Amino acid sequence: MATAASNHYSLLTSSASIVHAEPPGGMQQGAGGYREAQSLVQGDYGALQSNGHPLSHAHQWITALSHGGGGGGGGGGGGGGGGGGGGGDGSPWSTSPLGQPDIKPSVVVQQGGRGDELHGPGALQQQHQQQQQQQQQQQQQQQQQQQQQRPPHLVHHAANHHPGPGAWRSAAAAAHLPPSMGASNGGLLYSQPSFTVNGMLGAGGQPAGLHHHGLRDAHDEPHHADHHPHPHSHPHQQPPPPPPPQGPPGHPGAHHDPHSDEDTPTSDDLEQFAKQFKQRRIKLGFTQADVGLALGTLYGNVFSQTTICRFEALQLSFKNMCKLKPLLNKWLEEADSSSGSPTSIDKIAAQGRKRKKRTSIEVSVKGALESHFLKCPKPSAQEITSLADSLQLEKEVVRVWFCNRRQKEKRMTPPGGTLPGAEDVYGGSRDTPPHHGVQTPVQ
């Protein structure tokens, strides 16, 4: 298995010249692992030659975060592998806080362009010691040369072209790709979400910081105008305005005129009006039926005596009480203004009064009717007519009196027997039903 020399983590090398060599010059060595904005040159990003599937394996390491892009290794994933001069000049990874190098397996690309073989940490430590000496000498030269050749546009937010939490590429590495590389080869970059390098990647694979503060301040503004809004680049985005407040659904009058609430009476007002209306109606001498008939004749709304009674007793619904109140109030005002003189209300009330005046029977007449009832509780029509003529009463009055007397007798008779002397009363009557015969009371 032929492998080329690799840097600390994953220097990408191949015989097909995947990466371009650059003039001697190391990269920065520090705990932060950041590069300045001037350290990125256009020559760092060469187009990847399509020799198979470079960086196609799912568990290849992205060794180039945006803060530690290797010098001369831009064609291999955004400054990912270092490798100045094609042989690997420096390590983009920072050492651990305890002074020990952070050891991770590296990826070496074979002659056929595949990077499936992983090397252990022993070979990486030897290579790292050799590269540290060259890196210190090339650091200043690298910075001076790149300051002169730095293109105006280096930062490209490739993350905007592939939004969504499911994207596996690191936003930090994609932040340093040029526009041509970000559009064509952005899908080739992957990151392992379960590893954390100096706090740059979180446990869920989300980058803690996209790129260096200097690069962000220098290049974010002109590029944000050409891309869609990014959630990290617009922290002060205004939320949508809240919807206008609406009234509760149980109050339909919330959006009507302000005067509608004033016209609607309260329950206390209805109770007070019903009490006053009943007192005035009785004082004026009108019955509930008279009021209902007058409302129907005058205003076109016929109400029964039961409706007026329920209004006075506050037994109607609140809605019906509110509808009936103005009509009754109007009738009451007209009745008060016309008191003492015959008006249309009096005429209508007289027409509506169909109840006959209560008949009062004298004591002597009542005694004669009572004696006749003892003889014959249910007289015939001829007997009622002759009795009415003898007592100087109307026939209807005599008939109603006998009906009421029979109902009274039925209420006074106990269920298990008859009153004393009942056999004498009902014994000779031909109209007596069989169950009215003489019965022996239960002892």
From Swiss-Prot:
GO terms for molecular function: DNA binding; DNA-binding transcription activator activity, RNA polymerase II-specific; DNA-binding transcription factor activity; DNA-binding transcription factor activity, RNA polymerase II-specific; identical protein binding; RNA polymerase II cis-regulatory region sequence-specific DNA binding; sequence-specific double-stranded DNA binding. Its main location: nucleus. Residues 354-413 bind DNA. Expressed specifically in the neuroectodermal cell lineage. Transmembrane segments: none annotated. It comes from the Eukaryota. Residues 215-224 have a biased composition (Basic and acidic residues). Gene3D superfamilies: Homeodomain-like (1.10.10.60), lambda repressor-like DNA-binding domains (1.10.260.40). Residues 64-171, 201-267, 409-443 are annotated as: Disordered. The modification Phosphoserine is found at S341. Residues 67-90 have a biased composition (Gly residues). It is found in: Nucleus. Residues 262-336 form the POU-specific domain. Pfam families: Homeodomain, Pou. Residues 225-235 have a biased composition (Basic residues). Keywords: Activator, Differentiation, DNA-binding, Homeobox, Neurogenesis, Nucleus, Phosphoprotein, Transcription, Transcription regulation. GO terms for cellular component: chromatin; nucleoplasm; transcription regulator complex. GO terms for biological process: central nervous system neuron differentiation; cerebral cortex radially oriented cell migration; epidermis development; forebrain astrocyte development; forebrain ventricular zone progenitor cell division; hypothalamus cell differentiation; myelination in peripheral nervous system; negative regulation of gene expression. CDD domains: homeodomain. Residues 125-149, 161-171 have a biased composition (Low complexity). Belongs to the POU transcription factor family. Class-3 subfamily. Interacts with PQBP1. Interaction with ISL1. This is POU domain, class 3, transcription factor 2. It comes from Homo sapiens. The lineage of its organism: Eukaryota, Metazoa, Chordata, Craniata, Vertebrata. The gene is POU3F2.
